[in-house]
Amino acid sequence: MAVAAAPAPPCPLEARSLYRFYRAGDEETLALQGVSLRVESGDLVAVTGPSGSGKSTLLSCLAGMDDPDGGIVRIAGQRISHRTERDRARIRARHVGMLFQSANLAEHLNVAQNLALVQSLAARPSTDAPDLLGMLGLQDRCGAYPNQLSGGELARAGLAVALANSPTVLLADEPTGELDSATEAHVLDLLIAVTHRGTAVVVASHSSAVAAAATRVLRLDDGKARW
């Protein structure tokens, strides 16, 4: 008797025909115009484009922080768009890591406590904190507070927090924007290492180095996407 093949795992991140409008008085801005993308495990997708092209808006919609006016976003097969905030927060906690130019660290908690906080919200098996800190070269800084970290350490600590819940998808918005070239190269090496663990990574950036490191590049111009 033939054994049925196991079903394929769901796509880590899929967005279809995203539209997002912003209104200010009588003026209306179309920030996203029919943007679609599919990001598989191990992909590193760079989202490029000039300031105001829709990069941050796209990442906010992908993370479920902002709801598109049209279209749908699925993470690990679950629809995150057009859901209650409680449902979106639950999906984010389980499947999404977020990394921004300003590190996503609680100032009153040390590095280890920041990781523990994220892991407590994940409700799923998480990356072992000592292993994660060791991978990022922070094993001797776990008791340090954000204001005690250098710029490079702060970037790595932000990445550690973003990876603490073993995310299916990592979304990064200008993560290297304020770093010198050497530190930027190190952070990019770490992001590539993350893809080797099977994580789908999307990075919005102006940096040519980020685009060069990506497996695919999505360029936004006035909210329109071009691969």
Language-model segments: which ranges?
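Conserved ABC ATPase signature
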Residues: Y145-L149, E153
